[in-house]
From Swiss-Prot:
This is Man(5)GlcNAc(2)-PP-dolichol translocation protein RFT1. InterPro entries: RFT1. The keyword Aminoacyl-tRNA synthetase does not apply. Pfam families: Rft-1 (PF04506). The chain crosses the membrane at residues 192-212, 216-236, 257-277, 288-308, 450-470, 486-506, 524-544, 550-570, 588-608, 613-633. The keyword Calcium does not apply. Residues 1-96, 651-673 are annotated as: Disordered. It is a multi-pass membrane protein. The gene is RFT1.
Length: 673
């Protein structure tokens, strides 16, 4: 065995960088306080240096793996050796910021990306309206359903489960394992997230193969090619999933923003280019279905490449691996080595996947099956009950109508899920419960304002605006009964937006704190709601001949049921934690706002404010400003408190949690004595 170089004891925090080669010891442990008398003794204790002698290797396999813990003292800052490589912590740069402020900043960044995304989609739709038909939009909607199904079944459950696996309170990387990383350290937790990300990759291969075999979804030429291209795009997208989940764990929203911003623009250019090439072939329908497939493939290639590059750049100095790697459990006994260093001897076997997280992901996956049937159930019903024309009408209304929902509400939902997952652990403190209640009440109350605007002005204003956007080709979107036209469906969709927004906010709380048993109960409830949704949708679309409008009303019924279930769950959650519950009066607007809003809604129902010209639009804008003024006057104090809450500079939650943990530790020590 080669002689190991000696090390002068610099300080208690210095890391040895010269013991063995990089191949021999992936991560060098901290240097000891006192120089040992025997170099071979260091090699035996390390467990990370590869022995050249076969007899020694045989002997080493009988030794348990070991983790070194250097003595730690508070308020000691060690100077860095100028020859020592600089180590950057994989802990996200936002750890020192308050959790609420970080979540709000991330949500703001995602809102910016959604604005860019929807502006690009808006421009693309406007260009496609010049060359595409409602039937082409209907065919592309079915391709989008295939893509969303593969991605949802492959990654949604894993993503939601991994949001519980945060870096808060994890041990620093002074714990070193010769064969990899250690459980409950920063690097060990990051490695667990990366390992779980590869489950999505494997699931994506399976579901993509199943979807590719089901290419006879609609009787259009090139349908088989289009479906197979979409499935390839899904697998390419999922190839970067380990990098995505790591970026979200580290709260690196900029990586996601960069990936989506570039990919969205490329997708729009590719989709429109292929649509132009196919416009002269059978009205553009047969060749046009390939445009969406090629556009999505370009999106997946760009987004995956950007994710991989940015996440690797952010984690250049790391102790974990981007490939699946074993994690050493931290279930052990303390021993004292000959050189007075604390050594943890591990008898448990290393693992790749965290079992509680896997079980949670399994429970969530069952629940997401029902959730997907409800979320995408409208596409299933519209493809079963309605022709391609009505499918196209619903698709274009969904693209335009969901602009506000996806620009504003979806990023808020993502931010709330991240916030609640980090704030409310297994044993949340009283301060954490109070803060979560304040944030939830504020969001729900704001959404009631949105509901007033949507119900008061949406049905009267949006049909005219949408008809204007359709332009000269608007006639082909108004065939048949007026109630089945695209503008009429858009007016109904305005009523659906606040239900969708409120449900997203409440379910983000449920998904952040629910146990596997809670998720199973939710899955059963969603199964019942899906039956109700399908029954009501079929009745309204087919029996009452409402077309796509019937589907919108069925969605409102569905969202109402889901909101009711979430409200009951949240009530019992706070009761079970013996915390002050949500006061219903805190969720309702003031009397002045309610009076103004009800007056506006009644006027809309009786035809007052019906828009047929831009002059009428101006009148409605004036009424909307009056409602906004009433909100500002009535809710000025609540709005100021919300702004102060978001801009809070000190994370009192972390301080209180630390104090409670110290009290529990003192209590347990007293009981042991």
């Amino acid at each position: 065995m080669d002689e190991l170089p000696s090390h002068e004891p610099k300080n208690r925090y210095s890391r040895s960088s010269s013991i063995g080669s990089p191949a021999d010891a992936r991560y060098a442990p901290p240097s000891p306080l006192h120089e040992p008398s025997d170099a071979s003794q260091i090699a035996i204790a390390m467990g990370g240096v590869r022995q050249r002698s076969a007899s020694i290797r045989k002997h080493r396999r009988q030794q348990p793996s070991q983790v070194f813990i250097p003595p730690m003292h508070e308020n000691v800052t060690a100077p860095r050796d100028e020859h020592e490589p600089k180590m950057s912590s994989p802990v996200p740069e936002t750890d020192e910021k308050p959790l609420l402020q970080t979540s709000a900043a991330g949500a703001t960044l995602l809102i910016g990306i959604q604005i860019l995304s929807k502006l690009a989609s808006f421009g693309l739709n406007q260009m496609l309206l010049l060359v595409a038909t409602p039937a082409l939009f209907g065919a592309n909607a079915q391709l989008e359903f295939v893509l969303n199904t593969v991605l949802f079944f492959s990654r949604e459950a894993v993503r939601l489960a991994l949001q519980r696996l945060t870096l808060a309170g994890k041990k620093p990387d002074v714990y070193v394992f010769g064969g990899g990383v250690v459980q409950d350290t920063v690097s060990g937790t990051s490695q667990a997230v990366i390992n779980m990300g590869y489950i999505s990759v494997l699931l994506g291969v399976f579901f993509s193969s199943v979807a590719a075999a089901s290419h006879s979804l609609f009787s259009v030429a090139y349908a088989s090619w289009a479906v197979q291209l979409v499935c390839i795009a899904a697998m390419v997208d999922l190839a970067s999933e380990p990098y995505y989940v790591l970026a979200m764990q580290q709260l690196r929203f900029r990586s996601r923003a960069a990936a989506e911003a570039v990919a969205i623009l490329v997708r729009c250019v590719v989709t429109f280019s292929f649509t132009l090439l196919a416009k002269d072939t059978d009205g553009g329908l047969n060749g046009g279905v390939l445009a969406f497939a090629f556009g999505q493939l370009a999106y997946s290639l760009i987004s995956s490449a950007v994710y991989i590059y940015t996440v690797r750049q952010d984690n250049r100095d790391r102790q974990f691996s981007f490939r699946p790697q074993k994690i050493q459990p931290f279930e052990s006994q303390m021993e004292m080595s000959d050189n007075n260093r604390d050594v943890i001897t591990h008898n448990a076997s290393p693992y790749y996947l965290d079992k509680p997280t896997v079980r949670l992901a399994g429970s969530i996956w069952i629940q997401t099956v029902f959730k997907h049937c409800l979320t995408e159930g409208d596409r299933i019903l519209v493809s079963y009950f309605l022709p391609l024309y009505d499918q196209g009408v619903y698709a274009i209304v969904l693209n335009y109508g969901s602009l506000v929902a996806r620009i504003v509400f979806f990023p808020i939902e993502e931010g709330l899920r991240t916030f609640f997952s980090n704030l409310l652990g297994e044993k949340p403190s009283e301060t954490a419960l109070k803060l979560s209640r304040q944030v939830l009440c504020s969001v729900v109350r704001i959404y009631t304002y949105v509901a007033l605007f949507a119900a008061g002005f949406g049905p009267t204003t949006l049909p005219f605006i949408f008809g204007t956007l359709l332009g000269a080709r608007g006639g082909q979107w108004s065939e048949g009964a007026p109630s089945r036209s695209a503008p009429a469906v858009m007016g109904a969709f305005a009523l659906y937006i606040p239900f969708m927004a409120l449900n997203g906010a409440l379910e983000s709380f449920v998904q952040s704190v629910a146990t596997p048993a809670d998720l199973r109960r939710q899955a059963v409830a969603l199964g019942v709601f899906s039956v109700v949704f399908a029954t009501v949708g079929g009745l309204l679309m087919k029996t009452m001949d409402l077309g796509a409008r019937g589907l919108v009303f069925a969605n409102i019924v569905n969202m109402t049921l889901r909101i009711g279930w979430s409200v009951v769950f949240i009530y019992h959650y706070y009761v079970s934690h013996k915390a002050e519950n949500v006061n219903p009066t805190h969720l309702l607007p003031g009397k002045l706002v309610i009076a103004t809003g009800v007056t506006t809604i009644l006027a809309s129902l009786f035809g007052v404010g019906r828009v047929s010209s831009f002059r009428d639009v101006g009148i409605n804008i004036g009424l909307a400003l009056a409602l906004a003024a009433a909100i500002a006057v009535e809710e000025r104090q609540a709005l100021v408190q919300l702004v102060q809450l978001v801009r809070k500079k000190e994370d009192k939650v972390k301080v209180d949690d630390k104090e409670e943990k110290e009290k529990e530790s003192d209590k347990s020590e007293g009981e042991s004595e």
